Amino acid sequence: MQLTELIETTVTGLGYELVDLERTGRGMLCIYIDQPAGISLDDCEKVTRQLQHVLTVENIDYERLEVSSPGLDRPLKKLADFERFAGSEVSVTLKKPLDGRKTYRGILHAPNGETIGLEFERNKGEAAMLDFTLADIDKARLIPQVDFRSRK
């Protein structure tokens, strides 16, 4: 079983989604997890303990294990991510330029089959729609929406 498969099986078995996995040259293993209700420190601790056990049993070499939430600007990698975050503001970078542009920022539309839609502003207030597939994407991330106004 490959490392990604092993980690994904463990994480999903605990009721979480594996968002991303990074392995650095210095032996650090970074795991990003999520769930609809969000991730707490207790969730990260629970997954860390289970992964430490699994990685030891499977004799996987690593120096340090870090488990965290993907953050406010979480990456979107699977079609399910694009479905879940439809209506959110995102930044999408395409592998190849379209109309002389690779990076787009706009409102994500729910996928229609394999096609994902992004409503963006082309020229001073002129709305346009970009249609693309997962294969077209170099990277896609949520744009953090933070409200610093106090609630009264």
Curated annotation (Swiss-Prot):
> Which biological process terms from the Gene Ontology are attached to this UniProt entry?
ribosomal small subunit assembly; translation
CDD domains on file = YlxS_C
Q: Which InterPro entries match?
A: Ribosome_maturation_RimP, RimP_C, RimP_C_sf, RimP_N, RimP_N_sf
Show the GO cellular component annotation of the record. cytosol
Q: Where in the cell is it found?
A: Cytoplasm
Q: Which UniProt keywords apply?
A: Cytoplasm, Ribosome biogenesis
Coarse class of the protein's main subcellular location: cytoplasm
Provide an example Pfam family for this protein: RimP_N
Q: Note whether Cytoplasm occurs among the keywords.
A: yes
Q: Does the keyword Cytoplasm apply?
A: yes
Q: Which family does it belong to?
A: Belongs to the RimP family.
Q: What's this chain's function?
A: Required for maturation of 30S ribosomal subunits.
**Cross-referenced NCBIfam families:** PRK00092.2-1
HAMAP family reported for this sequence: RimP
What is the protein name for this chain? Ribosome maturation factor RimP
